[in-house]
Amino acid sequence: MTSQPFDLITVGGGLGASALAIAMARQGARVLIIEKEEKFRDRVRGEYLSTWGVAEARALGIADLLLQDCAKECPWIEMGFGPRNVPETTAQGMSPITYSHPEMQEVLLAEAEKSGVQVRRGSIVQGIEPNASRPVVTTRNGKDERIGARLVIGCDGRGSAARKWAQFESHKNAQPFQFAGVLLTGVSGREDLTTFLFNPELGLVIATVPQTKRRWRAYLGYPVNGGLALQGTEKLKVFLAESAKVAPGVGESYADVECVGPLASFEAGENWVNHPYHDGVALIGDAAGTNDPTFGQGMPMTLRDARVLFDALRAHSDWDRAGHEYARQHDQYFQDMRKVCGWLRTLFQDPGPEAQAIRQRAMPKIAEDQTRVPDHLFGGPELPCDETVRARLLGEL
């Protein structure tokens, strides 16, 4: 069966898909979201949207909706240098926001439907046929269906099938770390402050992210060579014990917690596509590129992808040209953020002897001048990331 074509089809219905679909539908585009999940469930995902990501959400017209229905502002952060007021110390002047990831997804998908987007849940995409003039998506939901569009967007995450179907070449950079997370109640701490702390001598990093309904998402990054297997709620005591090693006071903050969601871990490696557009198919978010999750840049990057593609589609009547323009910009900001996160990983997380030598040189200088640490995690990829920035961070200047 062949259906009438849409302007835009998204494979996946998460953050990037819904944000882009809402923006396009408000401009009069005919948009279809195909989401295999009939209901989003709690998994270990990002739930802290840093300042530059909030700016992208505002540009796409969804920030106020999130704050109204599922999110809260979390303006303070502690990274070992004392509490920092993020909106007062970033160019955007906006507070980071936090939320439950599945609740955010449901809110945005409902808004997409209100905006005129056709949403199909429980449908399984079976393939994509790239074509610069009319790509086709094949789905199954009781029957096979071929659906054409001007543009197909793969928004189906780090294990993207769309990436494979459209024959994009993936590039991988494995990292010797795992990243685990769990949803907790009973954390002792300020509900307007996120904690993000490293212990590089042990290769450990923790984050505690307060969200709505007095819940906290707790994260732990740890070396793969330590023999830990943090999978399943029966491993909660191990998760908490390892987290307590990062810094004084962490164990006390977890003394009375209860687990209210799954405990899971995954690899902290990088995976990306160069130039994530060809022949009528674009990739955004984790489908286009997965950065090291330790640094929490996945959601801001997803919203940047959605906004840049949205702007390109509005600017060019030739959507093939628009797709290439999006992909060109994506490569630049994705690789800039990847580069900076690599520097931060070396200095703050790598327990190896070379990194230890760098810390001995760099940390005394940083203690005297914290502007040596580049602020891309909050300010975004427009900040400088040249050789001078690297050398100042690593104490070479």
Model-assigned labels for residue ranges:
Residues T2-G16:
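Beta1/beta-strand and adjacent pyrophosphate-binding region of the FAD-binding site
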Residues D311-L397:
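C-terminal helical "tail/cap" subdomain of flavin- and related membrane-associated enzymes
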